[in-house]
């Protein structure tokens, strides 16, 4: 399961989550992550954090924030962070699928190599692959790797879709070019 962080597991902020003390877990997020684990999912956090490239803070800060995240929601198999800004045009910042591909390679040794944004949604590497996020950029990254897509309300987070996932729902529709 590819999972965005802010707005999915914890409340986001227009000024970034700048410290572990600012990380407020959305009620029910821990139980939702545990439900995914009980279903056999491996959890890969994929989060854009441009505050790093903006010089607001460094790697040590993101590690301390993610340490608190793991204390609060449980074991996370992979924590991927894109430090870049939109203008940096990297391959890891969502909606590009770089973080998801890298996490997939770490977890199962395979990833999607190319994305045809104008073509059909690719087949997932694993039929249970899913992306949970609160923004269209999350949905775009998930679409690019063929994952089932679950878009959440940022104030409710993962708890708003966990029952759909448990019920093996097909997920939300998304077209990356509309």
Predicted region positions:
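Asp-based, Mg2+/Mn2+-dependent phosphohydrolase catalytic module
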Residues: 60-63, 67-73, 77, 87-178
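Conserved protein kinase catalytic core
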Residues: 10-12, 54, 139-140
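Substrate-recognition element of Asp-dependent hydrolases with the DxDx(T/V) motif
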Residues: 29, 33-62, 66, 75-88
